[in-house]
Structure formats: structure tokens, C-alpha cells
């Protein structure tokens, strides 16, 4: 589906801090769900690089705000962008089920809106709203198929879930379970949320080990929790690779963990593709160009055999 958007003649430059610079610049406000997320930090860095890549007279400046995982704070940031009369808004939503008001306020103000990394839960986005995301179910399927093949279709797994308010958690896990349905010999021993955090992943796996729970693999919704799981297993003397661990994101730490054998695999979520795509989509929308409303950046599996290709 394509969505038409409004025209503005503004262009040039980039702003890294709060507030905007020259009045002639095309201004884009960006609200990120949280700055302390490893993957989203990489997305943010690529957004900055993309914004700085445009030629003089046709560039943009970005104003980043940290919502600190607070839905109310994020809405307030969007409202501030609207009051500043920015040319476009990019949002990495805190809660994918709570984006309707953000979309409503932006569209009523006539300001193009792009969601990045996390797509709102609603099936159809309003006119003037676009999303640059990846198919999270695909990531879950890639993880589980790799692990199922390595286990020979038999064994026990545990699942580390991300933030339960995030549909990436729901959809990645849905993909995992779609594959599991083909392998009745693989059972889920435990399934709990680690909220995307390394220390939470480590704590959960440590607790399961203390409880005497036996499992052959850890399926994690992201690399950070997967690395935490590897740390927990190492702390009790488990030989690396004897319990298979799969993550998602392909962060630098995740790639290093695959290269060292701490993770059996990860799934590359293209931070550059998402960051570049969001800035370019917002820029085109602000200039009145028509773009695809749903831009999907593909996932790619990472194993010891190809990890060097992602570094």
C-alpha cells in the first residue's frame, strides 16, 4: 500500500542534540523507546549517519528524545514535536499496543509519522503513517528451525521472552512455536520474560539451573538475554556449546558470542536497514513523495560459518 504525504521545501544538515538549528533545515523529531537498549543504540547511530549523508540543500536535522520505556513520556515527546512544527516524526514505540493516540495526533497535525523497528499492533496504518520494521515471526522461525535441526527433533528448551508490551516478543515467540509444532519431540521446559536485558536473562537461567531443570537449548528473543544465558551456564561449569543458545539482533556483542561459540546462532536484524530506511522514509514523506507504507527489512541467520560476513 502506498500513502501520499504533504510537501515541505525545507532541507539541509543534522542536529545531534535537543532543539533544532537553522530554520531552513528539514526537521525530524525522533522518540526512541529507550536509549540504553544495545540494538536500538545501533539503530540510532545509523539514523545519524544517514541524516548526515544527504547533500547540502537536501538534508535533514534530527532531534532525538529518550522515552525511557514510558508510554506517557513518549506521547508527551510527540506532542512537543508537533508544537515545534517539525516536518516529520519518527517513533520507536514503547508499547506497540498504545500507538493509536500518537498516530492520531500526528495525522491531525498533518505531520508525517514513521514507526521504526517496532510496528504498531493495528493491522492497517492511517494515511500519512508508515512503518520500517522486520518480520519478527521470520526471526523466530529461523532460530527454532536451526535448533530443531541441531537437536535432531528431540529435547527440551527454555524460552527467554522480551518485553511483554512489545509485539516483537509476541511475534518472535509465535515463529518459534510455529516450528515447534512440527517437532513433538521437543518440549518447552520454561518460558519467562527477561525484558530484553542481559542480567535478567542470566538470572532466569541461573534460577532454572538451581531448580534442577534440564534443557538442551535456550531460545532468546534477543542477543542480550542470550548472552546472559551463556554467562549463567558458564558460571556452573557448563561446556560452551553443550547447551545450544540462539539469539536475535546480531549486535556486536552477539556476533562476538557466536564467533566464540557462546551462542550457537543469532538472527541478524538489520539496524542499518531500519535506521536508514526510517530517515529516508520520513524525509520523502516530508517532501510530499509517495512511499510504501509498510517497509520490511529482512532477517538473516548468523552461525559460526558466516559470522565473519556480518562483522
Where do the model's predicted regions map?
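A residue-level marker of the well-folded mature domains of exported/periplasmic proteins
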Residues: 22-311
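Gram-negative bacterial Sec-dependent N-terminal signal peptides
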Residues: 1-22
Amino acid at each position: 500500500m502506498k500513502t501520499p504525504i504533504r510537501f515541505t521545501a525545507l532541507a539541509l544538515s543534522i542536529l545531534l542534540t535537543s532543539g533544532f538549528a537553522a530554520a531552513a533545515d528539514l526537521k525530524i523529531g525522533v522518540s526512541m523507546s529507550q536509549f540504553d537498549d544495545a540494538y536500538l543504540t545501533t539503530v540510532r547511530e545509523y539514523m545519524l549517519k544517514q541524516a548526515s549523508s544527504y547533500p547540502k540543500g537536501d538534508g535533514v536535522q534530527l532531534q532525538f528524545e529518550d522515552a525511557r520505556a514510558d508510554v506517557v513520556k513518549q506521547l508527551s515527546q510527540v506532542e512537543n514535536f508537533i508544537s515545534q512544527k517539525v516536518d516529520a516524526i519518527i517513533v520507536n514505540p514503547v508499547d506497540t499496543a498504545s500507538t493509536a493516540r500518537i498516530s492520531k495526533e500526528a495525522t491531525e497535525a498533518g505531520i508525517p509519522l514513521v514507526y521504526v523497528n517496532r510496528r504498531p499492533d493495528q493491522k492497517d496504518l492511517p494515511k500519512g503513517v508508515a512503518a520500517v520494521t522486520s518480520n519478527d515471526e521470520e526471526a523466530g522461525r529461523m532460530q527454532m528451525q536451526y535448533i530443531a535441526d541441531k537437536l535432531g527433533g528431540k529435547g527440551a528448551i527454555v524460552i527467554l521472552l522480551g518485553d511483554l508490551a512489545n509485539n516483537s516478543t509476541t511475534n518472535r515467540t509465535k515463529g518459534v512455536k510455529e516450528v515447534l509444532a512440527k517437532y513433538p519431540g521437543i518440549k518447552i521446559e520454561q518460558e519467562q520474560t527477561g525484558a530484553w536485558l542481559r542480567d535478567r536473562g542470566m538470572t532466569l537461567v541461573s534460577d532454572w539451573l538451581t531448580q534442577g531443570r534440564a534443557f538442551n537449548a535456550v531460545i532468546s528473543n534477543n542477543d542480550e538475554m542470550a548472552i546472559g544465558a551463556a554467562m549463567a551456564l558458564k558460571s556452573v561449569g557448563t561446556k560452551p556449546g553443550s547447551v545450544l543458545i540462539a539469539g536475535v539482533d546480531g549486535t556486536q556483542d552477539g556476533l562476538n558470542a557466536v564467533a566464540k561459540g557462546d551462542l550457537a546462532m543469532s538472527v541478524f536484524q538489520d539496524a542499518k536497514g531500519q535506521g536508514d530506511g526510517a530517515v529516508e522514509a520520513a524525509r520523502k514523506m516530508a517532501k510530499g513523495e509517495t512511499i510504501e507504507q509498510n517497509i520490511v527489512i529482512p532477517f538473516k541467520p548468523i552461525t559460526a560459518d558466516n559470522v565473519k560476513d556480518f562483522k
